[in-house]
Amino acid sequence: MLAPDHARASDHAGLSRSPVDDSVADRRPILVVDDDAEILAMLRDFLESEGLVVRTAANGEEALDLLWEVEPALILLDMRMPVLDGWGFAERFRERRLRCPIVVMTAAESARRWAEEIGATAYIAKPFDVNELLQTIERHRQKDSKPN
């Protein structure tokens, strides 16, 4: 399980994981939005070790600011954050008519309901299995159809 109190993502090298599909040259980042600095660092390290480009934000406001600079392939979104929570982020995201799959990630039992409330593509419960995380990302991320 990938959890904040576990070792760094690079220490998970011995685990059997589902490979991320790199047959498509997609360099658009995965945007991870979470107020827990350890989770951000761990997810960034792990996803980068899987060949993905990652950007991080500590709250919804930072994430919205980043969206002026990058077009993510997928957003991993925590719901309970200071400054601007997941609900506020989703509302402002939609107001800007942005389109990108959003995967809610939360430890709350209400994950499914919250994902439905904000119109998220999917949800994943914390702590999550690395295989489940990679499969969710691969299943829902937008592929860049432009050649490099």
Task: Identify what each model region corresponds to.
Residues 81:
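Receiver (REC) domain active-site loop signature in two-component systems and cognate sites
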Residues 1-29, 131-148:
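Non-catalytic signal-transmission and effector/linker regions of two-component phosphorelay proteins
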Residues 65, 87-98:
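Short amphipathic alpha-helix used as the core "switch/output" element in two-component signaling
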Residues 88, 108-124, 131-135:
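Alpha4 helix (beta4-alpha4-beta5 surface) of REC/receiver domains from two-component response regulators
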